[in-house]
Structures are given as C-alpha cells and as structure tokens.
Amino acid sequence: MNGMPYHSTGITRHVTSGYLRFHPMLTISLFVVALLSAMLPVVALNSLDLYVQAAKEGAAGQSGGYTYQISGGSNDVAEELRQQVQNGKAIGVKSTRGSVGITSASGSSRNTIADITFLTGPSRYGTLIEGHQPSQKNEISLSRAAAEQIDAQLGDMVTVQCEDSALSSDYKLIGITVDAANTNTVYATAVSSKDNLQNIQMWLTDDDATVNQGKVAKESATNNVNIGYIKSTIRNAEETVRARDLPGCQWYGIVLFLCLLCVHIAVMTAFFRAGQCSGDAVVEALVACGFPLTTSRWTVFRGLLICTIPGAAIGIAAGYAVFGLSYRTIGSIFAQYWEWQPSATSLLSIFFVAAILLCSLCLTWLVLFFRISFKHDITTRNALWYIIPSSAVLMFSCVAIERYHAAAWPFGGSVGSVMGACALGPLLLSLPWLFRTPAQCSAIERTRSLSAPVCALALLLLGASSLFSGQMMIATGNSDNGLFIADYLTQDDLNYLAGKYPETLDKAIVLTAPDESRYLVRAATSHAYDCVIQHGSDDADCYSDSDNETTVMLVDSNSSLAGKTNDVHIAEGGNAGIILIDPATQKITQAAQVPTEGTDSLLNDYTMPGVVLGIDSPQAKTLGLAPSNRHTLVITDFPSIASGVRDSIRSDIINRCGYAFITEHDTTSYRSYMARAIAMPALATIISGLTFAALAISTRQSQSALRWTLQEFGVSRFQLMRLFRPLGITMSLGSTIAVFLGWLGSHPWIVAPANKFGTTGWWWLIPLPVIFIETALFCWWFSLPERRNQ
C-alpha cells in the first residue's frame, strides 16, 4: 500500500462514496439543510426587494406619474399654467371625494365612495393592469378595488357624482389600475374638458421650461410656488418604507446569515463525527494506509461538498421557481401588487447563499481539523498574572459606572460597562476554585492562554450589546415623540386632507408662512436684537449666528399658539424681537419688538417656528405681514390615531404633495431604534454562543489524554463534568454580570429624572437563556466518557 501514489483517486473516491452510503440519514439531512437554507434567502430577499419596489411604484403612480408637481402661486402663475394646459405642456389636476357607480340593464345601480382625480390630459395615475390609461375627454379608469365593489367591466359607463356639477357626468371605463403599494385603495381617475376644471389644485408636467422659466420660477424662489419632483417622491416613499415597515432589515439579514451558518456548521460537524465509523476513524485508517493527512481529511470532507453544493444549487433554483409561482400571492398578503422578473438585484440572493456556503465550509474545516498545542508550566502562580490586572480593571469599571450615575463622568457608563465585561473572563477563569484538584489545575492551566482572551472578547461583546440595546430603547422615549409635521402644503392640499380626514384636521394646528416676496421675516434672540438696535438695522453681523435665528409663522387668531414663542426668543419684558431682511441684499431693513402671550413648549421643538403670531393680530398688521399659500400641518398626537389612518395620511401627503416635507418623531425613529435594540443582542448571542462553543470543543480536545487517564482510574461522569466547571461558570455567571453591567451603563436613572427618558426594555436579556442552555448542554457533553476510535 505504501507504494501506491498518494494521489490515487480511485481508492479515495470509493472511500468518499462509501462514507456517504454508510450515513444515509445524515447525507439526506445535509442535502435538505443545504436546499432549504438556499430557498429561504432567495424567497425572503426577493420578497423584500419587491416590497420596496411596490412602495416606490405606488408612490410614482399616486403622485401622477409626471416629472413635476406644481402647486400654489399667485393668479399670474395660475394664468400662465392654464396657458400651458391649452398648449399641451401641462395638465391641470383637481382631486375630490365623490361617488362612482354603474347602472345595470335592469335599472339597479351599484355605487361606492372613492377619491376622484380629474385631469385635463392623459392620466398616469396608478399601475395599469387591464385596458389602457384614460387620455381623452369623458374617459375614466377605476382602481381594482373600486371596480370590484361596483362590479364594473371595461366598456361600462360609470356615473360620477361630486360637489362640482360640471364634473359630475357619465364616463366610459377604459382601464383598471391599482395602487401598487396598497391594492385596497379605492380611487378613480377621469379626463374632463380643459374648460371644466375651475380652481385647479395642482399641475403636472414633464416640461423643464415650465418650472424653470417665467412666473413659476420667480415665485418658487420665494416659496410662494411649490414644486414637487417625482424622484423625490419615490425616494421619500422608499425611505419611509425602510424606516417604518422594514426597520433594521440589514441587521436581521445578518442574524439570518449567522443562523443559517450555525445550522450548516452543526449539521456538517455531526455528519463528520457521527457513529462508530466517524470521519476521524476514516482519516486515521487512511493515514495508516500511507495517505497524507491532508489527503485523508479531504477524502472525507469532500463528502460534505457532494451534499451541500448540489443541495444549494437545487435550493436556489427551487427558490426562484417557488417565488416565480407565488410572488403575486405573497404580495397580496401585504396588500401590494407585485410584478417580478429576474434582474441584477434579484440575483443578489445567489451571492448571499454562496457566502453562507463558503463560510460554513471554511469554518467547519477549522472546527474539525484545527488543533492547538499548549505548553505551559502547570503552576497556580500563573493565575495571579490574570487575577491582579483583571481585578483592577473591574474595580475601575465599577467606579466609572458609579461616577456616571453621579453625573460626574458622562462617558463613564459606556466605558465602565465595556471594560468590566472584558475583565470578567480572565478573572473568573483564574479564581481559586479552579485549583481544588490537580486535574482541574492541569486542565485549566493548559488552556487559559487561549480561553482567557476568547472569553474576554465574548463577554465584551455581550456587555456592549446590552449597553447598545438599552441606549436604543431609551432613545425611543424622547419627549418629542408623537409629533407629525408636514411643511410646504398649499390651501388646496389642506382642503383635500380636511375633506378626507375631518376629525384629524379639526384637532390639528395649521401654521401659515408670511408672504416673503418683499422681505424675509425672522425672530431674533434678545442679544441679537439689542445688537441690531445698537449698531443699526443694516448690520448683518448682529444676526450672523444661526442659533439666534428662527422663523416666524402665522396662525388663526383663535388658536392657542397665537402670540406664543419658544423659551429662547422671548425677552425679559415678554416681548419678541422681529427682524425683516431684504432677500436680495440680505441686509436687515427693519426691527421691532412685539408683545407676546408667553411661551409654549411645543415651539421648543427644533422643527417648529420660534414665534407664532395671529394672522389678524395687531403685531402682524404693524409689521405688515400677509399670509402666503405655504402652510404647515402639525398633528401633536399622531400615535393615538389608528394605524391605518396614519398610513393613509402619510401616503397622501408623500404621493399627492411631492413638494411637502414631512417630519415625524414617532414611528420612524421608534421602529428603527427598536429594531437595533433587538438585533444587536441577537447578533451578540449568536457570535458569543459560537465563540463559547468553539472554545468548549477546543478545551475538550486539549483534555482528551487527561480525561482518558481519569477514566482509567474509575472517575464518575460528575467528576468528568467538573473539568468543564471553570469554563461553564465563566460562560453563565460571566454572561449574566456582563449584560447587567451593560444595562447599568445605559440606564440614566440618577443622571436625569426618569420621566425624560424611555425605559431600557428587556431585549438586553436575550443572550442569557441561550447561554444558559448552551452551558447546560456542554455540561452534559463533558460528562460523557471519552471514546477512542478502534
């Protein structure tokens, strides 16, 4: 046999195939695991991609589908745009609520209430699924939900009734569309005569010259005309979906990757070490026959490749096949309309699966064949080199955390919790209980140089994840939660929203920007205002500090905010300094002190104006302030509104008012922080669990000879398990203390009153149950007698 060439492939092939036949259940299990772990990412990642794409397509369709949305402006702007409508370069739009229905041959009618959009030209609203978009006078398209409610078919005459009698008429149904982001939306889009649309609310155009020239461009410079861009609308919709519906999806992607990686490694390891004819036994037999060690290992290891690579390839193909057959059904679960075809983005899941397979094979090779030799002087004095510095670091961390809670060291909580968690590993592995028996002393001294730094890193990760999770949960409790602000709305936009959401708009606050075509209106702090009085109204240096500047808004004189300021822009006498700035020269042209009605905490938010004056107040008249067509909608209790209504309001503003700017303090930040608060402990659990598992396996391998010697002397299983006690205590007790230190470092219960913050939640405790279960399993495994391959 020794004369046989080492690269003799015939024998090694028979050995590999024989090993697979000898372990049929494990071979099938490995193949199935590879197949399923490839199918799952393909379906999940493609579903996520189509979810976002549907939101973007829905935003584009509901915004009108044209490059620009134009709203607001003076009568001169309206006249200019009407001329563009007549020239075919722009389309007038009017949206309202009304009834759509059909009358059957028997005389019975079926009606439903819908959002109706009237256009002067071709429609691009919605995603067309049947027929074609209306483009001629008296043509209409219905959403699929509206058509189903009235049982309408293409070619039917649809009766439209609304508050505008000129638009109430019969229209021919020529198209069925759908809001790709929400298929339950009930709406209709009709083309009417160009002469019928009075009080046009908005104009749509693809013509760059329309928005960049003439009166539209002139008034847009002073915010009197709002211009929305379809690209911005799509981008805002995508950001909203990623922040609200899919917060932390990248973190959960990493968690999925690590979970599948763990499953692969576990099944591959079991495949190699299972049964009496294990991979180790086959490797030893091949080495005894004269094959090199690497060739012997590869002979068995490639059996893993034979199972996993075909399984993953079939899983990828099956995943795309399943997704191709079911993506419409999956989309309907989320009330979305999905269209899918293979693209470069959809193929990213292949790289995801390939990365899992490659990493699992590499790590499995290390787990199976990597060996570390330990050569240390077995003496208890070596423990002092770990106990003394780690104890000092732990004491310092406790002091740092105490100083943090005493409001002395702002970063003491973070630094102390991380350093303390890091010091726990070497300290617990070196405490005196390890030296009660010579066997324990010998076992731990041989592995401490590896286990101490590894445990330190694992516990550091657990402590940091607990700290991070607590901080993220506290961040969700900020005092500005619940505020919803939509800026740059026009009066027509407000009328539309008030008609659709009357209860919400009745409780909301509507701020109106002053007309700034002649001068900019700003409020100044007392220091900035005094500087203007002393050095002259044209001294811009007095007003150069941006912290001293805030906007001034107008509000209905009966509003509770009329005459109010924030805490910064009110002088000692209760007045507020108002400064008027020439927009052309940026010079201060006028300054005046106006009396106020006190302060309001709502105006302290950075997104709110610093001073609010009543529209008809003497202060506004003295300054010559006139209202513009730019409005800001403020909803102070947005989370208390039903979830469906919140989503509808948000979508209407994003899609129908592409020029609007939304600031939302509740759901986006809350969900994003919540996702991170969950994902970080989950990631730390997986990584630290794998680290402890690898360390435990390595520790048992290093104790193999010692354990065999102890067995020959007749030790019990409990005594064998005691060899794992130092590492087990470090894993369980160390993890508990580490996450508790992280929680202490994140909890500001002494630094500031608790009512100013949220709670730390309980997600930081995620690692502990997993680590406890893992410790118990390794205790059982270490209690098993050592087995030698025959």
For each predicted feature, which ranges?
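Short amphipathic alpha-helical coupling elements at transmembrane boundaries
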Residues: 18, 53-60, 284-288, 441-446, ...
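Conserved positions within well-ordered secondary-structure segments
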Residues: 630, 635-639, 656-660, 723, ...
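Membrane transport/envelope proteins' first extracytoplasmic loop
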Residues: 1-265, 269, 274-278, 307, ...
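Transmembrane alpha-helical interface segments in multi-pass membrane proteins
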Residues: 285-326, 712-750, 755, 774
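Alpha-helical transmembrane segments, especially those used as permease/efflux helices
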Residues: 1-33, 40-43, 245-264, 302-313, ...
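The feature marks short, hydrophobic/small-residue-biased sequence motifs that occur predominantly
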Residues: 44-45, 87-136, 175-176, 509-617
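Interfacial "coupling" helices/loops that link adjacent transmembrane helices in transporter permeases
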Residues: 23, 265-306, 377-378, 691-729
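Juxtamembrane segments of multi-pass membrane proteins
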Residues: 418-419, 433-582
